[in-house]
Amino acid sequence: TGVVVVFLEIGNEVKIVGDIYEAINEGVRQGYKEGYLRKSIVNHPFNRVNTKDNTPAIIHTKLVSGDKIKLKIASKGGGSENMSKVTMLTPAEGIEGVKKLVLDTIFNAGGRPCPPIIVGIGIGGNLEKSALLAKEAILRDLDDESDDDIINKLEKELYDEINELGVGPVGVGGKTTCLAVKINFYPMHIASLPVGINIQCHSSRHIEVIL
């Protein structure tokens, strides 16, 4: 179920014949039909008519060097997505401000994102970049640690502190609220500290394909 999100990287030596976006959407149509998956996409914010094939996918494209195409594909559920957010902090709020924002967000979400959860955090860039950083963060391997000392320490601290909140599996209490915290970051404006928080439920359905 869920909306299909694709991070598409196209090498600059790759020649594509046809519409790659339509090819991706056709793959979604076939996959959801053949896999008997629930179709979750509606066509309009207010009319809300189901498209009946789970398209269109949300596709983020990046041009890179090389002769390969890489697709990171996720089926992102609505319950956890609804608990996600982007906040523009001030630089003065710093690490403690980020921690407070994340902990408040997870605590207030309770059982709605179907914990135990994976927490993706994007820090920096601007409003939309922080959201994309957070989305990509939830696709990282659970044992993938940041090679930045400050970020690595923050990931571990937040992991421990989230699990001390007592939300627990499905929100009924316990010590396992969070399976992982992953943080991606990017340079930003001197006056800004954008923070995106993307929450993934325990059913983390994603795959990476290289063509």
Residue ranges and their predicted role:
Residues 1-211:
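Non-transmembrane, aqueous-exposed alpha-helical and coiled segments at domain scale
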